[in-house]
Amino acid sequence: MARPGNIALVTARSAGLRGSGQPQGRRQQQAQGQQRSASLPGQRSKEKKKVNCKPKNQDEQEIPFRLREIMRSRQEMKKTLSNKKRKKEAQVAFKKTLEKEAKGEEPDIAVPKFKQRKGESDVAYVQRMEQEAQHVLFLSKNQAPRQPEVQAAPKKEKSERKKAFQKRRLEKAQRKREARAVDRLEQELLKDTVKFGEVVLQPPELTVQPRRSTSRDAPGKKSLMLKKMLLGPGGGSPAPATSLARQRILGEERERAVQAYRALKKLHRQEMTPAQPPGSSFQRQGHACL
């Protein structure tokens, strides 16, 4: 049986150990937490790494990666194919595949030739021969069936109607293209390019005269020297002098024409005025006398 003094001593020692063990455990936990946090890869990547990559040659420095990517993307944008070119390339590729399928001619499977290489062991040589033989057997088994006796179907020629339609279509497209080119040329001729800072001081001068301008010399209106001499003062030829008999005949003809005109006028006036009573003339004379 244990003594009471010994029991008290044991209990005191155990209490002292418990009190002193608590701070040591906390320190150990803190140290383990720091080690775990340092061992995490995310925190390592977050740490800034200072890298000093100096150029090998100061005169020849490389272009930055981002700038190279931008330049490459710009070059690709410039080299982009239009829809027409893409369609054309697709048609050419499709046509080639059709021709290849129509021909149906595939190359024969090459028979391997075996030869032991330098430094190759017998086991490796036999293994290589086995692999190549298995590969040839696989190709021959999975090859498409051939029919060498069957001839290829002849090409269908285009009908005359279809050829004429395509020809008309091409001509129409050519005419449209030419019309667009003419319109574009006219627009360029009508367009006047004005430079920056150009000042206009006067309207443009027309060097070409219109067709119906009065300033131009017409064929019948040219000022010739002979015309000036004829139409100038004293330049015209004098009229021939008429004889006295000729003058008398002309005077008589003129007098006869005047008398005939007067008689015709008088007759016309009498026809226009209505018939009057006989007393009216007497009354008119009386009134005239008064």
Swiss-Prot record:
Residues 1-92, 98-117, 139-181, 269-290 are annotated as: Disordered. Transmembrane segments: none annotated. It comes from Mus musculus (Mouse). PANTHER family: COILED-COIL DOMAIN-CONTAINING PROTEIN 137 (PTHR21838:SF2). Residues 66-89, 155-192 form a coiled coil. It is found in: Chromosome. Keywords: Chromosome, Coiled coil. Residues 20-39 have a biased composition (Low complexity). Residues 56-79, 154-163 have a biased composition (Basic and acidic residues). One of its GO terms (cellular component) is nucleoplasm. This is Coiled-coil domain-containing protein 137. InterPro entries: CCDC137. Residues 164-178 have a biased composition (Basic residues). It comes from the Eukaryota.
